[in-house]
Amino acid sequence: MFSILLRLSLVTKIFIAIILGFVVAFLFPNMTPYFSIFGEIFIKALKAVAPILVFVLVISSIANFNVEQSAKNFKPILFLYIVSMLFAAFSAVIADLLFPTTLVLASSADQAFQPPGSLNDVLKNLILSFVSNPVVALSEANFIGILAWAIILGTAFRHSTQATKTVLQDCADAIGKVIHLVISFAPIGIFGLVAVTFAHSGIETLKSYSHLLLVLLGTMFFMALIVNPIMVACVIKKNPYPLVFKCLRESGITAFFTRSSAANIPVNLDLARRCGVDESTSNVIIPLGSTVNMCGAAITITVLTLATVNTLGISVDIWTMLILCVVASISACGASGVAGGSLLLVPVACSLFGISSDIAMQVVAIGMVISVLQDSTETALNSSTDVLFVIAVDQASKT
């Protein structure tokens, strides 16, 4: 029996854990305190690895970033990737304004934090976080400071020897294995979190989860079926939907089940080849897109951050939301290197509003509960968009 469980996929294990959590919460609510330790350990582990994860991955990604100068159409495709992520984050902001989401957080009222009072406070906190001591930033989980120092060091390491870059990549791979180990215990942690949360809050929690999931998926579908086609139409000057549906059908469906943009690269390369894209372009741009083009991740980060803000009663003006869009887009670029995807980068955006790491990691755990659908749909959007823009720009350049 135990060996059969070990052979199951992580998604299946999480699904089983959620069901068991429901059963324990509603049939044996008095037993849930005994299981709370599982959720607490899981959140503690996430909090422990997240700062060093972001720091090492960003340094390694920037230091090893390499684009062949011969790659055709690089600039317009990269421009579409950037604009797409910004539009995705902005769409998530609009979705939150139309359908505001709140979450059920454990002991959120007990958390002491000082939310920013205005845009000036946000900008001041942002600038001060940038110049924070890197060691202090890591120890206090100041993700803005971590991101700033990682970008600076990564840029500096670009001029180092190949051996140094290889060491950085090896460090990133090692951290990735640690994250994989932590995530492998997600079913046990989620079981404890679901059992305790539903035993205390009941059906209201289920309503908040379903509403959050609908907002996330609705925004992703809006991006895939409305925003992306408009962008493609502006490029190819004709009906974009045949190409959009082709990419969703041949790339998106595969990515939905693999839940990995990197694993879907061969599928995208084959699709680009069959659509007549020059291999000197597709072989460079599509792997790059699987790393930096993360519009689905930008949506997830923005929606979850604003849901946290709504839950804590923090007032946010439109200018702060626009800053959040930029931060979410930048954070999303690092999502491909994280086993938990965009979820583990939510604390970066939450730190804009003075939200503590404790609360942010509770939100990450909530995201993992709905990740069976959220992460699959997010990956499908990310990967299909990678190849969509490559084919669109290639077609436009040939007309």
UniProtKB/Swiss-Prot annotation:
SUPFAM superfamilies, A to Z: Proton glutamate symport protein (SSF118215)
Q: Which domain of life is it from?
A: Bacteria
One Gene Ontology cellular component:
plasma membrane
- InterPro entries reported in the protein's UniProt record: Na-dicarboxylate_symporter (IPR001991), Na:dicarbo_symporter_sf (IPR036458), Ser_Thr_transp_SstT (IPR023025)
> What reaction does this enzyme carry out catalytically?
L-serine(in) + Na(+)(in) = L-serine(out) + Na(+)(out); L-threonine(in) + Na(+)(in) = L-threonine(out) + Na(+)(out)
**Molecular function via GO:** amino acid transmembrane transporter activity; symporter activity
Q: Where in the cell is it found?
A: Cell inner membrane
Q: What is its main location?
A: membrane
The UniProt keywords, alphabetically, are: Amino-acid transport, Cell inner membrane, Cell membrane, Membrane, Symport, Transmembrane, Transmembrane helix, Transport
What's a single GO BP term from this record?
threonine transport
Entry membrane topology: Multi-pass membrane protein
Q: Which residues cross the membrane?
A: 8-28, 37-57, 77-97, 134-154, 178-198, 212-232, 284-304, 312-332, 348-370
Q: What does this protein do?
A: Involved in the import of serine and threonine into the cell, with the concomitant import of sodium (symport system).
Tell me the protein family, please: Belongs to the dicarboxylate/amino acid:cation symporter (DAACS) (TC 2.A.23) family.
Name the UniProt record assigns to this protein: Serine/threonine transporter SstT
Origin species, per record, is: Acinetobacter baylyi (strain ATCC 33305 / BD413 / ADP1)
GN (gene name):
sstT
